[in-house]
Amino acid sequence: GDVYKRQIHKRNGKTILEHVHGAACGAWWTANLCADGTPNGYGVYEISGNTIANQYYKSTNKEADYQIRAYSATQVFGKSGSLTFGWAANAPAMNDAKCIVANVWNSDASGNWKVSLWQNGTKVCDMTRVKTYDYWAYAYHVLYYSKSVGTTWGKNLDHYYYGNLASGTPGAADFEIVAEDGMGNTYRTSKLQTDFTGF
């Protein structure tokens, strides 16, 4: 339940996609999400003959199309005067007031996933895949589960994307993140996660 990873391996000339699913019980068997920000949940596989016709991650207590969480890269999470976490302080490429970070937990390095940023109905950019932490989830586990900073529980994974708006800031902009998984599924969000409400 610590993370959700999708890794691609080559074995005997064949490409193998390995899924390490997040858990329905979350991190440490009690949290509301995994250490990498993946919501509690499970994998769904639709089989046709001897092929996987569709696959997606189903978050518990959420609709099947809940696949993305978006953040302002310059927002700092944590308690004022205490430990705080954020992308801008840790990744120079994301230190821009126009930058949005997306956690697309079911994405992988296959090249089949396309994640794009839209503003006012116009495509702004293809978002850049990046290996990083979900600092919102990191702060959540430090604050609510008393996890120590600098220990190995934090997961630096590669199912995150970032991109800059054409203008304005994420909190004020009319934006949409669109993720296409290569299996015919398209997921969207225009909601910015700013606090721990609902978790």
Locations of the language-model features?
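Short beta-strand edge segments in extracellular beta-sheet folds
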Residues: 192-198
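Extended low-complexity, serine/threonine- and proline-enriched intrinsically disordered segments
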Residues: 112-137
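Glycan-recognition and catalytic cores of secretory/periplasmic carbohydrate-active enzymes
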Residues: 11-12
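Short, small-residue-biased leader/transition segments that mark boundaries at the very start
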Residues: 3-4
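Aromatic sugar-binding surface patches on proteins
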Residues: 134-164
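Binuclear metal-dependent phosphoesterase catalytic core
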Residues: 16-107, 111-119, 160-190
